[in-house]
Amino acid sequence: MREMQERAYEKRGEQYLLIKSPPASGKSRALMFLSLDKTTNQDIQQAIIIVPEKTIGKSFDNTKLSDYGFWADWQVNPKWNLCNSPGEEGGKIKSVKAFLESEDKNLVCTHATFRFAVENYGTEVFDNRLIAVDEFHHVSANPDNILGNHLREFIERGKVHIVAMTGSYFRGDADAVLSPDD
C-alpha cells in the first residue's frame, strides 16, 4: 500500500471517511482495500461505488490485490459494473435493485444511476451498505444538488457507511461541498 492508502486503511472502522488526495495517487485502490475490509470484517453487506461518468468506472475493474500482498482480490461481477454494462435486469436502475437483493458484494455505477435508484427505491434499501462517492466535489450543499440531498439523507439516517474521495475540495463555483452540519 502507498502511504496515503495505509493512512486511509488505518481508519477503516470509521462510518464516514473523506479521502482527499491528488489525481493518480491511488484513491481507487484505497477504496478497494477499505471496501473489502468493510464487507468481509465489518458486517457491511455490500459496497456501491459511484463515479461521475462511465469512463471512470474502469478504475474499479477486477484487481489482483493479492499480487501486492493484500489478503483478498477486488472483484466486480461484470453485470454489476453498470459503467460497462447496460444492466441485465431491465435497465440500470432495476439492476441496482437486483444487486441489492443479491449476495454479490460490489457494484459500480454513475452518480446519475445512483441518484435515480435512490429516487425510485428510497434510502432504506441501502441500509448496512458502503456508499463510496468518487469525485466527491460533484456533491454540493446547494438544495438543488440531488446527490448532495441524498447523501445528507443517508447521513441523517445513520445506517450506511460513506467514503468520499476527491482530488479537490473546490467545485469551481461558490457552493460548499458540505454544509457545516454535515
PLM region spans:
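Walker A/P-loop
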Residues: E14-L34
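SF2 helicase catalytic motif II
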Residues: A112-T113, G122-A164, S168-Y169
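Interdomain helical connector at the RecA1-RecA2 junction of SF1/SF2 helicase-like NTPases
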Residues: H161, D173-D182
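Conserved pre-motif I regulatory segment
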Residues: M1-K20
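Conserved Walker A/P-loop ATP-binding site and its immediately adjacent core
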Residues: S28-F33, K38-T39, D43-Q75, T113
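Pre-Walker A (Motif I) flank of P-loop NTPase domains
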Residues: G13-I19, Q45-Q46, D104-K105
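Switch/connector loops and helix/strand junctions flanking conserved nucleotide-binding motifs
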Residues: G57-N62, F116-A117, A141, R171-A176
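Inter-Walker segment of RecA-like/P-loop motor cores
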Residues: G69-V118
